[in-house]
From Swiss-Prot:
Domain of life: Bacteria
Cellular compartment(s): Cytoplasm
A Pfam family assignment: SepF
Role played: Cell division protein that is part of the divisome complex and is recruited early to the Z-ring. Probably stimulates Z-ring formation, perhaps through the cross-linking of FtsZ protofilaments. Its function overlaps with FtsA.
Gene Ontology process terms (BP): division septum assembly; FtsZ-dependent cytokinesis
Family assignment from sequence similarity: Belongs to the SepF family.
Organism encoding this protein: Halalkalibacterium halodurans (strain ATCC BAA-125 / DSM 18197 / FERM 7344 / JCM 9153 / C-125) (Bacillus halodurans)
Protein name: Cell division protein SepF
Length: 151
């Protein structure tokens, strides 16, 4: 005796009883079909007007902005951070600031860049590039310089 028949006996289900119930259900079921409605000309016009809300992705894409800044004190670091928060890449020239304040600015901007998911790279002596997460930078300056001298 199989497991299936044990369950049927336990629940007192017979094949005949289950077939009878299925037949009764299938006879009572009547499918109602609606005919498609015809659209009026005004309905089509309204659909066309609402369909104009679709905008191509190329027109939405904004041009990337790069801001060049040359801070003279540590207090200007917040202005640089605000530019990064506004999703603009920033090149910072720290040549006109003391070495101690320049370190503080770089530390502050490193934290800002980390918080927004961006990146900071050294471009040259006291020159840094800070980018938000929407800007990808490929390559490094030292690689490019070495490749240029080898040619």
């Amino acid at each position: 005796m199989g497991m299936k028949s044990k369950f049927k006996r336990f629940f007192e289900l017979d094949d005949d009883a289950s077939m009878y119930e299925e037949d009764a259900v299938s006879r009572d079921f009547v499918e109602e079909v609606e005919e498609p409605r015809r659209r009026s000309r005004t309905g089509v016009k309204q659909e066309r007007e609402t369909g104009q809300n679709v905008v191509s992705l190329q027109s939405v894409q904004k041009t990337a902005k790069v801001v060049l800044l040359e801070p003279r004190t540590y207090d200007e670091a917040q202005e640089i951070a605000d530019q990064l928060k506004n999703r603009k890449a920033v090149i910072i020239n720290l040549q006109r600031i003391s070495h101690e304040q320049a370190k503080r600015v770089v530390d502050f901007l490193s934290g800002t860049v980390y918080a927004i998911g961006g990146d900071i790279q050294k471009l040259g002596m006291n020159i840094f590039l800070c980018t938000p997460d929407n800007v990808d930078v490929t390559g490094t300056i030292t690689d490019m310089i070495q490749d240029g001298y080898r040619s």
